[in-house]
């Protein structure tokens, strides 16, 4: 599991998010997020990207568009780890930019959970999920589940199913466009490991 957060900060607005989770063998995983954001303060030089990986090995964090200046491993399963991403050039008020976060995940011990989760704290137009499972057999055809949970509830017991997402056998992937999701919810796509 990797958890991506929309921070709800007043220093920027997130208009769209594109998430890709890809594995060829079920053990080595690449998780990437692209966020279109708009600066809402006079100058923005860096951003925190909070994440939670449920595997046991700390991921390798990079970015194609920003400099990763620090990674904070909280070493606490109840807290989010953090990557600090510095823009190549400072953003000015109302300027748009794309934030890129990439995590190379090692699940060789099989401890990670098979889901991608997003916290929505502010209005956003779209969250595009693409989960590519190249290691699945030609006969695999299980649906993934899109579900949500109020942010202030006990997460483990209060997820409600929104819909099932069919597995595309040609691309070996799940793909879903979550349009204008309701604020103050966790949204999660789960699949069979």
Locate predicted features.
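Lumenal/extracellular ectodomains and adaptor appendage modules
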Residues: 1-193
């Amino acid at each position: 599991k990797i958890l991506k957060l929309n921070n709800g900060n007043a220093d920027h607005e997130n208009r769209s998010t594109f998430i890709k989770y890809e594995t060829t063998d079920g053990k080595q995983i690449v998780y990437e997020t692209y966020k279109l954001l708009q600066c809402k303060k006079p100058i923005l030089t860096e951003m925190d990207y909070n994440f939670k990986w449920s595997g046991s090995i700390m991921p390798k964090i990079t970015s194609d568009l920003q400099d990763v200046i620090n990674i904070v491993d909280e070493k606490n399963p109840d807290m989010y780890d953090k990557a600090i991403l510095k823009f190549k050039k400072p953003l000015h008020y109302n300027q748009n930019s794309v934030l890129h976060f990439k995590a190379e995940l090692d699940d060789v011990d099989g401890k990670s959970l098979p889901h991608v989760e997003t916290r929505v704290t502010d209005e956003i137009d779209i969250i595009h999920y693409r989960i590519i499972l190249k290691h699945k057999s030609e006969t695999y055809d299980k649906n993934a589940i899109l579900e949500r949970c109020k942010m202030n509830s006990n997460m483990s017991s209060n997820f409600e199913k929104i819909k099932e997402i069919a597995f595309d056998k040609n691309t070996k992937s799940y793909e879903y466009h979550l349009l204008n999701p309701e604020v103050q919810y966790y949204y999660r796509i789960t699949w069979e490991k």
